[in-house]
């Protein structure tokens, strides 16, 4: 996997409160830029492995694209991993929540590409990295504001 972007943010919140927000991908657009819509497409609970969503996201020079997201891993109050079917990037989002003390957490957010294609890695991913890091930086500020309000 190729790292596209990452952030680490200290937030005045409990791990449980943060997890409840983060695991509900229908709320992803509240804090992550350029998410137009995101909706559940199966009856599994948020955070359950196999839970699936359909996300509409804005992509520069392309417009809006629909991406199918699936919860690949989840550990209650600690970690959420989703994988998307956006070809050729094949994104994987990994969110880790660490309790620093009773009232403060550290949220580590990372986005990876699962693409094995060397041309994609060489030609496309450098620009995707810049875009995703910009979005991630905005998202970390928004997430902090949302959880601390």
Predicted feature descriptions by range:
Residues 1-44, 48:
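Hydrophobic ligand-binding cavity/cleft-lining segments
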Residues 2-8, 52, 66, 79, ...:
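Intrinsic-disorder/low-complexity, polar/charged segments enriched in Ser/Thr/Lys/Arg/Asp/Glu/Gln
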Residues 8-12, 39, 56, 70, ...:
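Generic structural detector for well-ordered beta-strands
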Residues 11-13, 59-61, 73, 113-115:
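Beta-strand elements of well-folded, non-transmembrane domains
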Residues 17-22, 28, 53, 71, ...:
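Hydrophobic pocket/interface hotspot
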Residues 31, 74-75, 100:
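A short, compositionally biased micro-patch
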Residues 40-89, 138-149:
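Glycine-rich portal/gate segments that line the openings of hydrophobic small-molecule binding cavities
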Residues 83-134:
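Beta-strand/loop substructures that line and gate deep hydrophobic ligand-binding cavities in soluble
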């Amino acid at each position: 996997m190729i790292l596209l972007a990452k952030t680490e943010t200290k937030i005045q919140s409990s791990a449980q409160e943060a997890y409840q927000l983060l695991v509900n991908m229908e709320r992803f657009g509240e804090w992550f830029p350029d998410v137009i819509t995101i909706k559940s497409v199966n009856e599994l609970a948020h955070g359950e492995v196999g839970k699936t969503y359909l996300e509409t996201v804005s992509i520069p020079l392309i417009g809006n694209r629909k991406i199918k997201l699936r919860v690949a891993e989840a550990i209650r109050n600690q970690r959420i991993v989703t994988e998307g079917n956006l070809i050729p990037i094949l994104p994987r989002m990994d969110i880790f929540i660490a309790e620093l003390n009773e009232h403060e957490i550290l949220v580590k957010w990372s986005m990876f590409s699962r693409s094995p294609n060397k041309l994609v890695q060489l030609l496309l991913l450098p620009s995707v990295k810049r875009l995703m890091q910009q979005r991630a930086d905005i998202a970390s500020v928004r997430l902090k504001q949302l959880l601390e309000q």
